[in-house]
């Protein structure tokens, strides 16, 4: 009769089966030989060559712009947008960075008289161009008629989009005056008329998150009578 508390032979503490992953001396020699062979097939120089090269330094270009009537000489990274050149290099921060994807119009400026989203174009593409920002339209003592109309009709709330709205509004009236049609122009032979629908369509690329659209339209219609060709 077995003593109480005595375990069977195969279940005694410390009794284990050999580990399946045990490494013998023969296996160790095989692994060492394989490692040495790999070093011959893939020498250090080949492995080093596969490491990506360091990022090259940015290309810098001289750039001449005529901004708000003043000639500016810059040296910019060729990847710099016109928006960043105006804000970071020339410190003209009236032009706002909104979406930075050309979808809100907050960065609208006038380039050679035409409106442009400054975040969508590279500065070096405008060598020698004449650029007008909100700072160049008027001054606190001598407001542009469009600036005065926006104030008169409360064409803004938070004001973040206002510089782009005003620059775009000035260009819209010039487009209509020059006979450039829009998507809602009915008669493509005759010059387009300055209707509310025409203005709304042409201003649709400028987003006002505060929703001051009715007042913006009123401001544009008011200023149109004062802006001369």
From Swiss-Prot:
Gene3D superfamilies from the UniProt entry: 3.10.20.30, [2Fe-2S]-binding domain
Please list the residue ranges annotated as the 2Fe-2S ferredoxin-type domain: 61-137
Gene Ontology CC = periplasmic space
Which residues take part in binding [2Fe-2S] cluster 2? Answer: 158, 161, 208, 210
What's the PTM story here? Exported by the Tat system. The position of the signal peptide cleavage has not been experimentally proven.
| Record InterPro entries | 2Fe-2S-bd, 2Fe-2S-bd_dom_sf, 2Fe-2S_ferredoxin-like_sf, 2Fe-2S_ferredoxin-type, 2Fe2S_fd_BS, Aldehyde_Oxdr_Iron-Sulfur, Beta-grasp_dom_sf, TAT_signal
Give the matching Pfam families. Fer2, Fer2_2
Region Disordered: what ranges?
A: 1-21
Q: Principal place where this protein is found?
A: periplasm
Keywords in alphabetical order: 2Fe-2S, Iron, Iron-sulfur, Metal-binding, Oxidoreductase, Periplasm, Signal
- What terms describe the molecular function in GO for this protein? 2 iron, 2 sulfur cluster binding; carboxylate reductase activity; metal ion binding
Requisite cofactors: [2Fe-2S] cluster
Q: Where in the cell is it found?
A: Periplasm
Tell me the leader sequence span.
Answer: 1-53
Enzyme Commission number, as recorded: 1.2.99.6
**UniProt: [2Fe-2S] cluster 1 binding residues:** 99, 104-105, 107, 119
Q: Which reaction does it catalyse?
A: an aldehyde + A + H2O = a carboxylate + AH2 + H(+)
EC category? oxidoreductase
UniProt cofactor note: Binds 2 [2Fe-2S] clusters.
Q: Where is the composition biased (Basic and acidic residues)?
A: 9-21
What NCBIfam families is this protein classified in? PRK11433.1, TAT_signal_seq
Described function:
Oxidizes aldehydes to the corresponding carboxylic acids with a preference for aromatic aldehydes. It might play a role in the detoxification of aldehydes to avoid cell damage.
Assembly state and interactors?
Answer: Heterotrimer composed of PaoA, PaoB and PaoC.
Can you name this protein? Answer: Aldehyde oxidoreductase iron-sulfur-binding subunit PaoA
Corresponding gene? paoA
């Amino acid at each position: 009769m077995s003593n109480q508390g005595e375990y069977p032979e195969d279940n005694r503490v410390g009794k284990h089966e050999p580990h399946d992953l045990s490494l013998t001396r023969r296996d160790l020699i095989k692994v060492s030989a394989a490692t040495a062979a790999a070093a011959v097939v893939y020498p250090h120089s080949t492995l080093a060559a596969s490491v990506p090269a360091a990022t090259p330094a940015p290309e810098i270009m001289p750039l001449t712009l005529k901004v708000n009537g003043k000639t500016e000489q810059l040296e910019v990274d060729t990847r710099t947008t016109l928006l960043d050149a105006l804000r970071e290099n020339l410190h003209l921060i009236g032009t706002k960075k909104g979406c930075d994807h050309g979808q809100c119009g907050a960065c609208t400026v006038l380039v050679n008289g035409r409106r442009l989203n400054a975040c969508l174009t590279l500065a070096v593409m405008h060598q020698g161009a004449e650029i007008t920002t909100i700072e160049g339209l008027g001054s606190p003592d001598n407001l542009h008629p469009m600036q005065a109309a926006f104030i008169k009709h409360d064409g803004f709330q938070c004001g973040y989009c206002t510089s782009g709205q005003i620059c775009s509004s000035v260009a819209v009236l010039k487009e209509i005056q020059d006979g450039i049609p829009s998507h809602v122009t009915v008669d493509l032979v005759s010059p387009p008329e300055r209707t509310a629908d025409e203005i709304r369509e042409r201003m649709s690329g400028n987003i006002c998150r505060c929703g001051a659209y009715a007042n913006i339209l009123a401001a544009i219609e008011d200023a149109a009578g004062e802006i001369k060709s």
